[in-house]
Amino acid sequence: MNLTPKEIVKFLDDYVIGQKKAKKIIAIALRNRYRRMQLSPELQDDIVPKNILMIGSTGVGKTEIARRLAKMMGFPFIKIEASKYTEVGFVGRDVESMVRDLANAALNLVKNEQREKNKDKIDEFIENKILEKLLPPLPKGISDEKQEEYKNSLEKMRTKLRNGDLDESTIEIEISQNMFDTNPNLPPEMGAMQDIVKVIGVGSKKVKKEMKIKDAKNALKNEAGEKILDQESIKSEALKRAENEGIIFIDEIDKIAVSSGNSNRQDPSKEGVQRDLLPIVEGSNVQTKIGTLKTDHILFIAAGAFHLSKPSDLIPELQGRFPLRVELDSLDDKALYEILTRPKNSLLKQYSQLLKTENLELEFDDEAIKEIAKIASRANEEMQDIGARRLHTVIEKLLEDLSFEADEYAGKKFVVDKKMVEEKLGDIIENKDLARYIL
């Protein structure tokens, strides 16, 4: 999608309140990707993305900005937590697994696009597979009359299948099953091994299963995709997308910074993780199930609150790989009020739509919304600042009884006013000990 930086920021304004600096920097970074692709191949290789370090408390919009953009522009995107990785030689996930995760995200993205483009062919394949089970093909040498009868029966069955009349009927189908897909107890560090065995086909077997036709339609989608779609071209396109459009969002990077005030260096593996991360961010080759993925042009966005450490506590080499830094603003009551009212799918709209399913019309008057924002802001000031996430807790507590008794208000309109907000939340916010547990 070819959008100018101004258009990108305008799009983000519908979902993320404030944070103009962060939006601007990311918009420029994404536009530079488009600009790079217009250049000669030789020059493209020399232009590397300027990675971004976002500094700000939880809940201020760091992840949301990156996630929304990646989804809107159709870029492969993954969010990982730096604190979940371990240094090479320690038990746990190695940093290369984030690149394999990005490869999987790119592969799924391209597969879904191709399935959508070839939807009619895939639906026809699934339809024919199910019809073969419902009405097995006639043997050779059957009379023309019998063949005509069979053809008519097949078309009647096809019509019923398309109309959903047979959805509850049960059939036995044969589907591929991989032992790694069905074993949830495998450790995360087995990710590379899983990719390898899937590529060479080891551990995969055909199993027969009885299921309803509506479930069989979904179960056969993968097989249909494997048969109809060009798997090699899908992998090739996924590799290209991951390398040139991939975004890896590294959250909690402050958790692997070794604080200068910590003379004991309680966790020596933190620096080890940083050093393992360095070649990935600088540019290296990682083996994935879609091929050797070069990380040179992946955009890395790191984020952290940096309450107990500073960006300068990261090793100098890693600091240098994140040249663009932006500090996100904390959210005051005015920003929280806007978060409740401005976004397309604001929190209040979500709750209203949920209760609408119970035939209950829910409204919030303006004074009530302002009071909710004030209470959330005060809770953030007096306790840990969790940004906009505090609104979820506050509104859940406010609407707890109404959600429980929603059926009693069916067919009615319920207006949340300032008085109700004060009655439900006033005593809690005044009692700091109680507020710590509830809000």
Swiss-Prot record:
GO terms for cellular component: HslUV protease complex. ATP binds at I17, G59, V60, G61, K62, T63, E64, D251, E317, R389. ATPase subunit of a proteasome-like degradation complex; this subunit has chaperone activity. The binding of ATP and its subsequent hydrolysis by HslU are essential for unfolding of protein substrates subsequently hydrolyzed by HslV. HslU recognizes the N-terminal part of its protein substrates and unfolds these before they are guided to HslV for hydrolysis. One of its GO terms (molecular function) is proteasome-activating activity. Pfam families: AAA, AAA_2, ClpB_D2-small. It comes from the Bacteria. It is found in: Cytoplasm. The keyword Nucleotide-binding applies. The keyword Ribonucleoprotein does not apply. Keywords: ATP-binding, Chaperone, Cytoplasm, Nucleotide-binding. SUPFAM superfamilies: P-loop containing nucleoside triphosphate hydrolases. This is ATP-dependent protease ATPase subunit HslU. Belongs to the ClpX chaperone family. HslU subfamily. One of its GO terms (biological process) is protein unfolding. A double ring-shaped homohexamer of HslV is capped on each side by a ring-shaped HslU homohexamer. The assembly of the HslU/HslV complex is dependent on binding of ATP.
